[in-house]
From Swiss-Prot:
Belongs to the Mediator complex subunit 16 family. WD repeats lie at residues 86-125, 296-342, 615-666. Gene3D superfamilies: YVTN repeat-like/Quinoprotein amine dehydrogenase. This is Mediator of RNA polymerase II transcription subunit 16. GO terms for biological process: positive regulation of DNA-templated transcription; regulation of transcription by RNA polymerase II; regulation of transcription initiation by RNA polymerase II; response to heat; response to lipopolysaccharide. Coiled coil: none annotated.
Length: 818
């Protein structure tokens, strides 16, 4: 296994007021790591909980009280973390929602909180819901499942269509179904006394996409439904909870006074009450086949882990051996058998009833065990829904700062990695917890000082290729940053194959996954220092502009205005006015006030076309000299060229309705018509984008002499997904210091351009000045978005445009910058 990086946390104090230094961690589907530090901490004053102002690090430090602190960080910027909240109570549960946008915190004392980032800003968190189970200690929690699962089958990597590669989990149901079978959102809790609590999240209370300076946020108090998990209550020491395909939750726990028994229960939820009236949540708990252990000989259970491997229920039981003699890990699998029934006990007897010759029985069987040389800190199992056990691995995180990778069933050791060796000092740093990323490619580990370690997980026997993992992320919507951080080899060939496979999908499949595909491809191109974000913005502007078009006569239109425009442009007419005369102008009529509000977007479209044509001769020359082409170049993308031609025709028509919406340029001669020139050159480029003719290149070279070409805005944040970060990860193990941006990953490229010191809003295409007061910047790609977008938008078209940017196009979170 390869150690990717380590983040030293100098902010955390070496002396803790708690008897045990305990760090909980959890990784979301968006590759955001949440961890809790149950000790005194020194943190940046700008990253303070729900009252934080979101400033950049380095604005000052503040000493935190001896409380429980919760932080989050991105795996591509692990040195920079943000505070979620602090509490005087000890945190016992840390759990992400399935979509990675809500964080559940369970405390000793019975309080449960659900936090979420405000306006998708990773450094500004707000309390959304809370509930209380008085005089109880929360020891386990699980969000409701939506019943949508995808099987990862490495044997189908050669299939063409996504529907064949990634099958849906059959007969999987949500934890709680509402009206019409729609999955409900909520949580199930288990306390240390065996009390179950469940509550659903009201959908109407979700945070709107208002600006950061919008109305005050309202915290919703929820009343949970309570039910005892068993007939009697008892003190639970260790437990594990996992969803089952039937929609129920499987729970296994061990009690302190009954160490040789691991009890198993199935918990199901339902809504009781008449439809249309007030319904309440009902909890049903059923006892299942339990595990009866043999003589423990002084051992005590230290960990329980219930999971599903290849459609089988599996429980891992870890024991702490006496006198510090290491630990032991066992795997128990639930087997189902058909037992024959004696003829006298068989049912039936009627004319239509057949006797029951067999009855199904369940039992737990121990299939493997392994002796570990050190105490076990945590267990992690492959998070992918695999089809075969060969695609799954078990990770035993040991307190001697080592990790053992085990094979399921046989429990044979596949790999062993030793991190920093443990010293003999009593205050030595030890591994305490860990978790896998969504695609199970990176194992993240925290030690007792809340320092983060990242290691590349070894590929299993049927691990699949990097291409298959990336396509899996496209289909499931999971973040693919952990896959991109691996040593994928030839990125250009990977992008070409990924694009080729995507274009082979049916049109409705491409349309459904297009946003996920663009976000993934933009991250890959950013690692190759290639510009792909322009295509995403161009696609968003194109859909926004086309949504404004309405046919003049609904009764005699079998195609919309956008379809008719595409048909006319297929004839490759070089004159934009000729194309405009062949169209019905009434179909493109838009209110002049609305067109005025879209002027900055219109300016962006023509700026992109102008820059693309201006750089075309230089790009062609680079290709001839180097002998190889980049994996992506927008000037060779026929889809982008066609979208630009369509938008130029629409802009030409709208300019007749309102001249104030037309783009503005500084020209050397007054008789230059920019739209006519751009459309003519783009039409000629569309005929052969792979090899433009010499005459076209000559005309493109003259553009800089005819008008002033605006310089494109570049966003170059310091992340591991940049070209510098990708090269550093491939070179070997990296070491970072928390809250210190590594200089080795910074982009040192500087250009003397107009507005070089000015910040530009990438969404509105507006210059915000050198020091804007409130902006949002993407934590991954550096894209800038104004905070008060809802106040700027005066028309419905502009409001629809801003609503597209609730999330950044690259899949990252926003970061509030003051």
């Amino acid at each position: 296994m390869t150690i990717l990086y380590k983040v030293e946390g100098k902010e955390f104090s070496k002396d803790s007021v708690f008897p045990h230094k305990k760090v909980l961690c959890s990784v979301s589907a968006r590759n955001i790591v949440a961890f809790s530090a149950l000790q005194s901490a020194i943190f940046p004053a700008s990253h303070g909980g729900d009252a934080g102002d979101g400033s950049l690090p380095g604005a000052g430090l503040a000493v935190g009280a001896s409380n429980s602190h919760v932080y989050v960080c991105d795996i591509v910027t692990p040195w920079e973390y943000y505070k979620v909240c602090s509490s005087k109570s000890l945190i016992s549960v840390l759990q992400w929602s399935p979509n990675g946008e809500q964080l559940l915190l369970g405390y000793v004392g019975g309080r449960v909180e659900i936090w979420q980032p405000r306006n998708q800003s990773i450094n500004l968190w707000v309390l959304q819901y809370y509930a209380t189970v008085p005089s109880e200690d929360i020891i386990e929690a699980q969000f409701f499942q939506n019943g949508k699962g995808v099987i990862f089958n490495a044997l189908k990597k050669d299939h063409t269509y996504y529907a064949e590669k990634f099958e849906r989990v059959e007969q999987q149901r949500p934890t709680l179904s509402g009206f019409g079978g729609v999955a409900s959102e909520g949580c199930v809790l288990l306390t240390s006394s065996g009390l179950l609590a469940a509550f659903s999240l009201p959908a109407i209370q979700k945070t709107s996409a208002a600006g950061a300076d919008g109305p005050a946020h309202e915290v919703v108090e929820l009343t949970p439904a309570l039910h005892s998990i068993g007939i009697s209550r008892s003190f639970i020491e260790h437990c594990s909870m996992t969803p089952s395909p039937s929609g129920a939750l499987n729970i296994a726990f061990s009690c302190g006074w009954q160490q040789q028994l691991v009890q198993c229960f199935k918990v199901s939820l339902s809504l009781e009450g008449e439809l249309g009236l007030e319904q309440h949540l009902a909890i049903k708990s059923e006892s299942q086949t339990s595990i009866f252990l043999g003589p423990l000989d002084g051992r005590r259970i230290s960990h329980l882990k219930w999971t599903r491997i290849a459609n089988e229920d599996v429980i891992f039981i870890a024991y702490a051996c006496p006198d510090g003699a290491g630990s032991q890990l066992e795997q128990w699998t639930l087997t189902r058998r058909h037992q024959s029934v004696h003829a006298l006990l068989q049912g039936g007897g009627g004319a239509n009833n057949k006797p029951n010759e067999f009855v199904q029985s369940e039992s737990w069987e121990q299939v493997g065990k392994v002796q570990l040389n050190a105490s076990l800190a945590d267990i992690s199992v492959t998070r992918l829904s695999v089809s075969t056990p060969d695609s799954c691995q078990v990770y035993a995180i040991l307190q001697d700062n080592s990790v053992q990778v085990l094979e399921p069933n046989s429990m044979k050791q596949l790999n062993h990695t030793q991190f920093d060796r443990l010293s003999d000092a009593s205050g030595a740093v030890k591994f305490v917890s860990g978790d896998l990323t969504p695609s199970s490619q990176i194992l993240l580990i925290f030690d007792s000082h809340a320092q983060l370690y990242a290691m590349q997980a070894p590929l299993p026997k049927q691990g699949g290729s990097g291409l298959l993992l990336l396509e899996y992320c496209i289909v499931t919507g999971c973040d693919a940053s952990d896959v991109l951080l691996l040593n994928l080899g030839n990125l250009e060939a990977l992008v070409e194959k990924l694009t080729d496979n995507f274009t082979r999908q049916p049109s409705f499949v491409r349309h459904f996954y297009y946003a996920n595909f663009l976000a993934l491809k933009s991250n890959i191109c950013r690692m190759q220092q290639q510009e792909f974000d322009n295509l995403i913005i161009l696609h968003a502007i194109s859909t926004t502009f086309k949504s404004l078009l309405r046919p003049s006569d609904l009764g005699f239109q079998d195609k919309g205005p956008a379809d008719n425009l595409a048909i006319k442009l297929a004839e490759s007419i070089p004159d934009v006015d000729t194309v405009m005369l062949n169209l019905d102008a009434k179909d493109f009529t838009v209110e002049p006030v609305m067109l005025q509000s879209l002027q900055q977007l219109i300016q962006w479209v023509t700026d992109l076309a102008l820059n693309m044509l201006h750089r075309l001769p230089e790009e062609v020359m680079k290709t001839k000299l180097s002998g190889k082409r980049p994996s992506y170049d927008i000037s060779r993308d026929i889809v982008a060229i066609s979208s630009l031609r369509e938008l130029l025709v629409m802009i030409r028509i709208w300019g007749l309705l309102n001249t104030q919406c037309l783009p503005v340029y500084t020209k050397t001669m007054d008789n230059i018509d920019v739209l006519v020139i751009l459309f003519r050159l783009l039409t000629r480029l569309a005929q052969n984008p792979a090899e433009p003719d010499e005459m076209l290149l000559d005309e493109c070279s003259l553009l800089s002499k005819q008008l002033l070409i605006p310089q494109p805005t570049k966003f170059n944040p310091t992340t591991l997904l940049s070209a510098q970060g990708f090269a550093a990860v491939k070179s070997g193990q990296l070491q970072f210091t928390s809250m210190e941006e590594p200089t080795c990953l910074q982009d040192m490229e500087t250009e003397e351009v107009v507005f070089a010191s000015s910040v530009k809003d990438g969404v509105s295409n507006l210059q915000l000045g050198a020091r804007p007061s409130h902006i949002r910047r993407c934590a991954r790609c550096g894209f800038v978005f104004v905070n008060n977008a809802s106040k700027v938008a005066k028309t419905s078209a502009l409001k629809a445009w801003f609503s597209k940017w609730l999330h950044c196009h690259c899949g990252g979170f926003w970061k509030q910058v003051h």
